């Protein structure tokens, strides 16, 4: 039986806190049952890219964080999910673009969409807290 493939949506896979957390999990899961693939938002190779490939993961590169072309990003995401119906789980770690990639994943019938916040700085303002509450209600 093929492993379940979980698409991790991240800025890049350099050696920051978020990336180390994901890699610690990835190294210790049963990869015959669950595999992580990565949708990154920079073209430049990341610190963990070689290890990801060695562990059986795939890396898909988008450039929206470099070219700031949101229209192109939306088109690329639609094409991506059309070409990759194997993803039944999208685990997003990017609040800034989450409203785009989660809505497109939903449109393409990805049944499980996990929003993971790695910080609480957005809770320091009333606007940020209201946004947080709104996301919790959806």
Task: Please provide the spans of the model-predicted regions.
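Membrane-interface segments of envelope glycosyltransferases acting on lipid-linked substrates or membrane lipids
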Residues: 1-138
């Amino acid at each position: 039986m093929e492993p379940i493939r979980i698409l991790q949506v991240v800025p890049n896979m350099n050696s920051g806190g978020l990336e180390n957390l994901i890699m610690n999990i990835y190294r210790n899961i049963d990869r015959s049952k669950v595999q992580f693939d990565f949708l990154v938002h920079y073209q430049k190779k990341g610190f963990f890219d070689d290890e990801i490939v060695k562990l059986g993961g795939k890396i898909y590169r988008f450039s929206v964080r470099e070219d700031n072309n949101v229209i192109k990003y939306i088109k690329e995401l639609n094409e991506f999910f059309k070409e990759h119906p194997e993803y039944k789980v999208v685990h997003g770690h990017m609040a800034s673009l989450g409203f785009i990639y989660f809505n497109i994943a939903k449109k393409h019938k990805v049944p499980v969409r996990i929003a993971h916040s790695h910080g609480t700085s957005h809770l320091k303002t009333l606007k940020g807290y209201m946004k947080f509450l709104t996301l919790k209600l959806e």
